[in-house]
């Protein structure tokens, strides 16, 4: 046997899996924090991870290009004035987050592209992979920054939003990463969306359903939109806890708790009537400089988020929130002050893509598993500008947005194999 041939690398599923493990491990070390990883939106961790992939792409013989929003594209060769398929996800993480949120989707596309290139497999249309910046809202209170930039959708308010700790404006952070901020400010689309045949995003499931149903992977049927208030203030009147009777109190904590309880009742009613809805108040606190065991709290600060696949449900919840606040103001003598509402629209995914992804999975021996996405994703931006879009979820134990994300590499390979077959068969 020819020694050169026998020693030649075999670019198969095992090669993909080995490379996947190496990349996941390397980026985890590169972006590690005191717990988990931190890949800050338009910050060091996100940039380091993108640079790692870009250098590896060159070694693998792939073509790398960077757009004016510092998103990075990978392809087997330059694609000019031609329709193409696009796979991708985001490279940032929440502070002290897990290693697989976002990265799994970028890496799935990256590995499929590398596999196709090494094996010289021709497709009906060229394939690009995108590593998106800034999907997480945890850093600047704004989500989908990279994907919105692509389509000229970032607003002045978005660009003026400030970092959760440093107070730095998003626009400045973007410039420091090489973004051509003038183009972003002018709301110019950075690519011709008519050239994008479809967009597919693989992502870890960030809830417990795949684990509960023992599905290694599943196809997403739709993406919930959300309404978000990052900082609502309830103002009452501080006082001595022992001297003021209930009927004279203006207790901000009790007023806030009353509001959350009422909204929970509305949530329950809507669900009983078949509506799709989840509500969360993830931030709820008094002022640490003033709170005390024996002090009636005069002020609280809290967030409020509603998510649904139905815009009418989101609008109804916002109206109910404001209405209940007015009622509680009258009953408890407090005042609610609202910040600006931030909206993300629900997204309908392409029915043909959903069916073809299910068919691809079934042909590989997987159950025809599907579910809606409760979390928002970059895929929603692509879908809502009219691009045919699909999503694949991969099983992930121990939740997400925490350091304990536990995606098994075999489950990742299951999702990747479905995506790879879909792309090859398209």
Model-inferred region functions:
Residues 87, 96-136, 228-234, 243-267, ...:
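Alpha-helical metal-binding/catalytic segments enriched in His/Glu/Asp
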Residues 2-43, 133, 158-159, 400-401:
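N-terminal capping segment at the start of a domain
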